[in-house]
Amino acid sequence: MEPFPRILDDRLPRNMRRPRPIDKMPMRKIVMLGANARTQRSVSSIQLPAEYSPSASSAPYFNYSPDDFILDLRSHQSDEIYENGNSNHEKDEKKALKELLHERWENAKQYNAFNYPLNCMYRCLDGKYDLSMQLNIERGELRRKPMHFKNIKEPFNHLRFNFAKLHDHEILFYLKCDTDPISNDLLDRHLVAVNASPLERDHSLIVPSVNKCSPQVLTLQAVRIAVDLMLLVDDDMFHILFNSLLGQASVNHLHLHAMYWPYDSDLINRKCEPLHDVPNVYVIRPPVWICPAIVFQLDSLDNYEQFKMNIYKCVEHLTESNQAHNLFLARAQPIRTTGAEKEEDRRGERPQLVTCYVFPRMNMIGAKPPSNFNPAANELAGNLTSYTIRFFESANEQSVIRIIEEEASLDDDTFRSLCFDLADVLIGRSVGTSRPQDLDTLAGLTSPEIDELRDSFQSFMPRSPSIRHRSSTRAQSDEGSK
């Protein structure tokens, strides 16, 4: 039987037609970007990270605008009480952020997003600084093993853990500012995710531009997100923290911590001093507080841009100087430069303004070992976490300060020199212009070299507060015996 004439082939049903040459060709396998670390190059001019999938997450967006910002938490609470008592005022978008964070964080529990259930104990330490301490044994035992770092500006390494590898149920929501975009890049995704080893309820991670896979170096964009969230959450227990590499950071992928702490840090009640000739920038140092810090406060939304830029310039200088640092953002009363060292607002009458404390600190080379507690941003603000029941029960203010002095606090001369340099940076002068001559002689020396230089001229005196106290007591008794 002769085959069908070719002219009739197109008239047959599709399933009876003879295969054409193109149909015989094998289908080329399509490799999804992110399915394999050795993924094929995309035809797009923009190459996303291998692990990143922008459409995979079902997490919602939180949209906000500067109109939602709360400058003074105290006056906002008064206005809210009035509105609730006189009208059916709709809940603000800014209040929805707090509710969304809590709702999504609680919802993540059903997916086993956390390494352990929260079951923490607290105690307040007697002493000058009103330190509070949490017992969190599970965090010390079950958290991800900290990574080893040698430099503050280590490049991002996609082979190590990073937040592009988060599961969908770990992403709480994305951030988007409607009127003033956080980034000009439409592919940027700024997310808030669970912290799998939390300190407190709603403890989360803020990851700016997760698709960019930036190292743990604070950017102006990250500062902006931190300030915005502080202005959006109407709760004085809410804080945002940042730890640099060599300053207790565990992951080299740009992130900040968002969390609540059930006790006020006494840091917000302390007197400061001006940072030389720089307006609206302050310094706090021992003995007013347990460790030195640079302080910034947003007292008007007109100063919003300058506030962000000052924080960024400060951190940028520390990063370029390879100086480890921690940031602690809180709601604090207006900064005082006169009066008593400590003044509490017991009546709740003073404004509560967004305040940023930048703690320059000693560099800690290598992975942080498991110990009684690790002095990071929250600890330097007086909010301590103990990983052992023994230390939790036996710790006192002096033992805590001793650990902070030995592992974090800069010595007086180093901090003084840093303050002069920061004043030059913030004013726009050449760095070193305002530094006194006596500090110039120590420039370029490492901390051990400076200590050796001091030891050659004076007897060694341990920095322990308890030993210092015993020494002064012994000296007084010697004078009395004479």
From Swiss-Prot:
Entry GO CC: cytoplasm
Superkingdom assignment: Eukaryota
Tissue-specific expression: Expressed throughout the neuronal system, in the spermatheca and anterior hypodermal cells.
Summary of the function given for this chain in its UniProt record: Specific and highly efficient GDP-D-glucose phosphorylase regulating the levels of GDP-D-glucose in cells.
Localization of this protein: Cytoplasm
Reactions this protein catalyses: GDP-alpha-D-glucose + phosphate = alpha-D-glucose 1-phosphate + GDP + H(+)
Gene: mcp-1
Further comment: The orthologs in A.thaliana are GDP-L-galactose phosphorylases catalyzing the first reaction of the Smirnoff-Wheeler pathway, the major route to ascorbate biosynthesis in plants.
Region (Disordered): 1-21, 461-482
Family: Belongs to the GDPGP1 family.
Protein name, per record: GDP-D-glucose phosphorylase 1
Catalytic residues as annotated in Swiss-Prot or TrEMBL: 255
Molecular function in Gene Ontology: GDP-D-glucose phosphorylase activity; guanyl-nucleotide exchange factor activity; hydrolase activity; nucleotide binding
EC number: 2.7.7.78
Keywords: Cytoplasm, Guanine-nucleotide releasing factor, Hydrolase, Nucleotide-binding, Nucleotidyltransferase, Transferase
Listed GO biological process terms: glucose metabolic process
